[in-house]
A protein has these predicted regions:
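Elongated, amphipathic alpha-helical interaction scaffolds
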Residues: 1-166
């Protein structure tokens, strides 16, 4: 993958329809980008060198999607993704609270929408190599009893090296 290629082809500011189509296919639902959000999370120096692209968008239903492309996967991919997803969820919470306060409206947790963390790996972490014929891995929190509570965070990991090996 080439940094400039990905950034040019999948730039939500200039070609939102491409990012919408990709996200629609990945999330298995129609996606419309409402706006591109600023990247506010600090990145460590070595992390920045491995990230090809990192885009955060607000979707039409006000959910948040973070689309990241990495040259090589990090150690502890689940923990890292959970931390960034939690950061996005907290940013959304603060933004929604502030917006409602400005409008002099009462806050409700119902206003907080889902956060999707989507990571494409050029060279995926070793955990993904145990599943060489699978290249899309979806995660969502589920109860062991069957009760359904929306915990707002979903993850999709895409191993491009596994895909190329199929």
């Amino acid at each position: 993958l080439y940094d400039t290629f990905f950034k040019e082809i999948l730039d939500p500011n200039t070609t939102p329809e491409r990012v919408e189509e990709l996200l629609s296919l990945i999330l298995k639902q129609k996606v419309k980008i409402l706006k591109v959000l600023p990247l506010e999370s600090p990145r460590l120096g070595d992390e920045q060198s491995l990230i090809v692209m990192d885009v955060v968008v607000e979707l039409e239903d006000h959910s948040i999607a973070n689309l990241e492309v990495q040259k090589a996967g990090y150690y502890f991919p689940g923990q890292r993704a959970a931390c960034y997803s939690s950061d996005l969820l907290l940013r959304q919470y603060r933004r929604v609270r502030e917006d409602l306060e400005k409008q002099e409206k009462r806050f409700s947790y119902r206003e907080i929408k889902k956060v999707y963390t989507i990571i494409l790996y050029e060279k995926s972490p070793k955990e993904f190599h145990d599943f060489p014929t699978d290249y899309i891995h979806r995660f969502a929190q589920r109860s062991d009893t069957g009760i359904e509570i929306d915990l707002l965070q979903e993850y999709v990991f895409i191993s491009l090296d596994n895909f190329h090996g199929i």
